[in-house]
């Protein structure tokens, strides 16, 4: 249990001058969250920008707890002297359990498709939030605490350890990151692809493991149709790491492999990661700096699958398609027998679906304190206006939108929206907030404040109030105003008749007829459906 984990860590830390235990936050139920620092100079950890720092996180999904045991084993071996050399030129931060409340909701019956351990934690937090969907919106206290760790220590490499769901294959340790073809942080992604992956694959193979790519089947009933090469959005650890220039590796050990095998594979991956940082970490630091200093003119917001696949030889397993008497539908029954899929298609998510011109800045009115709090949690810099400022800015108005019909991760998301953009002259009053994109986290600011981005704060419903009207009209009040309006603008009569001819709902609804004119009166709410964030191009 969690207390036993902490008791073990305290004994380990007490036995070594190389380790230090630190509380960095509280779970939703009030459990303390801890990290372990491992360094030959604990008092200077993260103070030397030339010394690489590895952040390893386990238990973000507490049923997938391989990383905790692997990390505890590695810390033990470092503390007892066998692996002290791993800290020669690099330091380590280890979070044994991020979702502490989920860890304590342990049961024999939490994950039916995972082989071990016997007791498994729960996927979500006590607030029923999936922390690996929370990076961008940062609703959970656990995520807010984690962002504090990232901002404070500024790690150079981040490893997030999970266990898979889904298909069966021969690989026992699969992992992935944003590939260079779709990366915001191109230099960091190139280091992961050219330096990290070959070294980790070689170490795992030498230890008897079968490392593989992080992929998902295109067709659950026909694996031969190929696999999808996923590009994560910023709600996920690896997508978030890419947009904030933190090279991030998402480890997904194969759920159908024995627990011992998965833990030992994770140990090898973590050990090799430290070795690699000690030997080649300076190159990674330079890559990160180059990504943070880059100032591109455009930025991809989302990606879609490339219809022209690559091909790989994939170490899968054979299966049968069985007709279920219970569901009435076919399902896959894996045999566990090795099968090599020659030239299996891989459809990479490397085609830009949506992109945006990166503006000079975003301007936020002061009433959106929850949005400003999120920006601060992410480490995004902003300034507060102290005197009136006349400026020409871009205003976005929603012309079509749709909210989700059920909640996702505690929120009703804006599933789709289209915008009209126009330039306006505005005098901003003191208190308005300027978020410049000319900063290291400028592209993270775009991902959060550009409303078309899939994990923008707009998409997550932080600006839901803009979709509501709070002032209305009565027929006796609006009738004379419409007569007056038509006298002043007689061309509106023809426009109204054209609208009636084209719109059956308008023809058959007297209230909507009034509303057509109401939108043209000065009484109409000028903020309705207007995105409150103004954009400086």
Indicate residue ranges for each PLM-predicted region:
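Structured catalytic-domain cores with a bias toward divalent-metal coordination
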Residues: 1-537
